[in-house]
Amino acid sequence: MTADTTAVSVVASATRLVAKVGSSLVTNEGRGLDRAAVAHWAAQIAALRQQGKQVVLVSSGAIAEGMARLGWRKRPSVMHELQAAAAVGQMGLCQAYEAAFAEHGLRTAQILLTHEDLADRHRYLNARSTLFALMRLGVVPIVNENDTVVTDEIRLGDNDTLGALVTNLIEADALVILTDQRGLYDSDPRKNPDAVFVAHAQAGDPELEAMAGGAGSGIGTGGMLTKILAAKRAAHSGAHTVIASGRERNVLTRLAQGECIGTELRAVLPVWSARKQWLADHLRLRGRVVLDAGAVRALLHEGKSLLPIGVIDVQGEFERGDVVACIDPQGAECARGLINYSSADTRRILRQPSSQIARILGSMTDPELMHRDNLVVI
């Protein structure tokens, strides 16, 4: 991790970017929308559009606006009440952005996504095509998770993750995560006066995640761990990430002019194909298979398929075609992919050569547990 005072922000050269705005930046301390703040973001994005940049906005704030409209002072804990607030608030959020962008002659579109939309390959491709069509038409897409219909089990999670998934979906050059923090520190600056600000690092650097997971670390406070993981996801499509304070004056336009603000996490990880991104990020894991050292070497260094002889344990229950994680002998995930046999059948054929599959199961659909075209190395 280094600081480079001569660097130019990656946003300056980006032609397509995703901007994620946290709820604290568009609401009055959680008490409904701050229309002036919404107008401010619209003005900055309009300026980026005049520079020829395509921008997709991922914006929080629907639940806070819904609570204000419903007269609720306390955030409900019941899922259906939260979903009701999101449904009411989404109307206000869209109206506010529509009015703000109209001041600059721009149209907006609402895109609500769920995990199931992105897990289904056809719906995933359709969402991708729709977003590309909107950008070609000069429309500013405003994306949020469809909180009204999702459950805890199928949530995408936080909007940092959603921002990264949308970044990969549209093959954006950069992801800008705007928050109420300056960026990343090597420890919590509120507790450690000697905390060092991290201006530049590599997305996916294990040191960042180690700091985030360490005891007493502030880097995970305020959702910074989710931002680090979002940057790692975005890097697999070649997108750089900037984590910056939305309190900075005209932060988006200054980034676009090349000024380095906040923490920049550069993409140096191997770029995955669109299909492998879909496999890694959009399909829910259904189980795990533990591999021996030889199988791990074959997957990671030789680009081979996973054979049953290399599996030493099966964890969880899954069916043919589900996404299953491959775990190395130390317990770390090394790959994931679409499995060709159910968990029950996999348990019967593990540690066996492929030539024995038909004898054990009565037939053989595939000689591999996972074909190399249907797996991605993590």
UniProtKB/Swiss-Prot annotation:
Its EC number is 2.7.2.11. It is found in: Cytoplasm. GO terms for molecular function: ATP binding; glutamate 5-kinase activity; RNA binding. It comes from the Bacteria. Transmembrane segments: none annotated. One of its GO terms (biological process) is L-proline biosynthetic process. ATP binds at residues 20, 179-180, 221-227. It holds the Pfam family AA_kinase. Catalyzes the transfer of a phosphate group to glutamate to form L-glutamate 5-phosphate. NCBIfam families: proB. HAMAP family: ProB. This is Glutamate 5-kinase. It comes from Bordetella petrii (strain ATCC BAA-461 / DSM 12804 / CCUG 43448).
